[in-house]
Swiss-Prot record:
<feature type="transmembrane region" description="Helical">
    <location>
        <begin position="4"/>
        <end position="23"/>
    </location>
</feature>
<protein>
    <recommendedName>
        <fullName>Small polypeptide DEVIL 14</fullName>
    </recommendedName>
</protein>
<keyword id="KW-0812">Transmembrane</keyword>
<feature type="region of interest" description="Required for DVL/RTFL small polypeptide activity">
    <location>
        <begin position="17"/>
        <end position="48"/>
    </location>
</feature>
<dbReference type="GO" id="GO:0008285">
    <property type="term" value="P:negative regulation of cell population proliferation"/>
</dbReference>
<keyword id="KW-0472">Membrane</keyword>
<comment type="function">
    <text>Small polypeptide acting as a regulatory molecule which coordinates cellular responses required for differentiation, growth and development, probably by restricting polar cell proliferation in lateral organs and coordinating socket cell recruitment and differentiation at trichome sites.</text>
</comment>
<dbReference type="InterPro" id="IPR052153">
    <property type="entry name" value="DVL/RTFL_small_peptides"/>
</dbReference>
<dbReference type="InterPro" id="IPR012552">
    <property type="entry name" value="DVL"/>
</dbReference>
<dbReference type="Pfam" id="PF08137">
    <property type="entry name" value="DVL"/>
</dbReference>
<keyword id="KW-1133">Transmembrane helix</keyword>
<dbReference type="GO" id="GO:0048367">
    <property type="term" value="P:shoot system development"/>
</dbReference>
<keyword id="KW-0217">Developmental protein</keyword>
<keyword id="KW-1003">Cell membrane</keyword>
<dbReference type="GO" id="GO:0005886">
    <property type="term" value="C:plasma membrane"/>
</dbReference>
<comment type="similarity">
    <text>Belongs to the DVL/RTFL small polypeptides family.</text>
</comment>
Length: 48
């Protein structure tokens, strides 16, 4: 019984680590897209 509890605990910790890694990558990707978007808007609006 104790073995299953430890196994479940380790499995949930692995899932949390994977989620944190994925979440970090998503945030970085959103930041890149935001910067690209702002540059595009700036270039289009400054076109006189």
């Amino acid at each position: 019984m104790a073995g299953t509890v430890v196994l479940r605990c380790c499995t949930s910790v692995t899932k949390v680590r994977t989620w944190k890694r994925c979440s970090k990558q998503i945030k970085e990707q959103r930041a890149r897209l935001y910067i690209i978007w702002k540059c595009a808007v700036f270039l289009l609006s400054s076109h006189d």
